[in-house]
Amino acid sequence: YRFPPLKRLSFDYVVDAHLCQTTDELQAFYDTYTEQFFQAMETGKQWGITVSSIKYHNLEQIKMRACAGGFDLTPQGTLSMCFFVSSPKEAFYHDFIYGKVEGGKVVMDEAKFKRLVTCSNNSQLKCGRCFLKWHCAGGCLYHTKSYSKEMLEVMCRFQRKFSLIALANLLTGQNILKHEST
């Protein structure tokens, strides 16, 4: 082979406030993503490929905030807290950029970095009662900035549904979505 065979694939969902006009459209989008993700996971097993995603990986972690934060270098030489944000053309670019590489050195706004890295949404009232509080940790800052309150509620439902399916699949050793429809 010119390239070694694939061993791992990550399929993550799209985050775009303009992708769907209504909460029903967004829910349908995430429902389709969930079905396709678990189908891909099953297909991957047949080929010896581990299929994962950010949401799936988060189930293996206990954390205080949704994301540890990034040291993501953009094409402009700036440092972004979030891999979703990499271009000055993006609405939240200046919210997530905290430094740059200049003259062969990393220059950081340490106060902004600290603000970004300590930001957490897991103190929301609804999170206190959620079984995913320490895995979802209140959701992603990028989601919070991107979506309306109603759209964020769809994200919460998606997170819970996706996680329950993942856990049921692990317990049963099969894709419950596939067996649910037969």
Indicate residue ranges for each PLM-predicted region:
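Conserved AdoMet/S-adenosylmethionine-binding subsite of the radical SAM
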Residues: 1-8, 40
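C-terminal accessory region of radical SAM enzymes
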Residues: 30-58, 85-131
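Short, small/polar residue-rich loop motifs at catalytic or cofactor-binding pockets
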Residues: 64-67
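Short, ordered coil/turn segments that flank beta-strands lining enzyme active or ligand-binding pockets
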Residues: 74-75
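Hydrophobic "anchor" residues
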Residues: 78-79
